[in-house]
Amino acid sequence: MTWVSLFYVSSQDFDGDIKSLKTVFSQFEKQIHQKNGYRFSPEAEFAMGWCFYTIYVKIGFIKKLVEYNHMRDPKVKDEKAILKIVQNYLKMQKSKARIKFDRDKPTLGGYYHWLLR
């Protein structure tokens, strides 16, 4: 499977935020019974007190995660819902990190449009 850049993270507390993100993504792996579905960019960029790095996922990992969450909640149709889950978890951890899609358009938008109407 190929790796795609999915989320872009801006963080002021690199160690705390990376720990929180690893926790939430490990939970995702447990939910769908898949290992090594995500990884972080090998080098973070540092500028003016902020750390910037990318989260890469395997296409199959994110597809299974969306399908799993869609079965639990039919409103989940693409990885936008996964982004909201991650953002909410970071808020609960009182993190100031900002996470967004690495590009303008979600990866699976076209794939799930016809499947999950």
Model-identified regions with their sequence ranges:
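Short, extreme N-terminal segment that most often corresponds to the first beta-strand
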Residues: M1-F25
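Structural alpha-beta junctions
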Residues: Q27-R39, L90-R98
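Short intrinsically disordered terminal tails
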Residues: M1-T2, L115-R117
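Ser/Thr- (and often Asn-) enriched beta-sheet segments in non-cytosolic proteins
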Residues: S5, T54-Y56, R98-K100
